[in-house]
Design a protein with these regions (language model features):
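Short, surface-exposed ligand- or partner-binding patches at beta-edge/loop junctions that are enriched
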Residues: 63-64
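Rhodanese-like catalytic fold shared by cysteine-dependent sulfurtransferases
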Residues: 1-21, 27-59, 68-105
Length: 105
């Protein structure tokens, strides 16, 4: 199963310290320039080779730049049996306190 969450819902999950596995699907350079604290960088081209790193027992929360790539990945991961949420609007929509740098937009 997969579903969309808003950037503010992600902020709430982080505030509540929910057991999520946060995945940043952007390229490494973008990740290094700034990301949401706690995220693991798995660029789109690596994600499918690294699915064994994704815990089946936790909600996988994906984000990319604007949302479409992570939404497609969320659908595919759900077909593989993962519980997945996709951040609507990607990192562009996130304005919360968990950004490691302000220049990641």
């Amino acid at each position: 199963m997969w579903y969309l969450i808003s950037a503010s819902e992600l902020e709430q999950y982080l505030d509540e310290k929910r057991e999520i596995f946060l995945v940043d699907m952007r390229d490494r350079e973008s990740f290094r320039s700034g990301h949401i604290r706690g995220a693991v960088n798995m660029p789109e081209e690596e994600l499918w080779e690294r699915t064994k790193e994704l815990p089946m027992s936790r909600l996988i929360v994906l984000y990319c730049y604007h949302g479409p790539r992570s939404m497609l990945a969320a659908r595919q991961l759900a077909r593989m049996g993962y519980q997945v949420a996709d951040v609507y609007g990607g990192i562009q929509a996130y304005r919360g306190k968990y950004l490691t740098e302000k220049n990641c937009r």
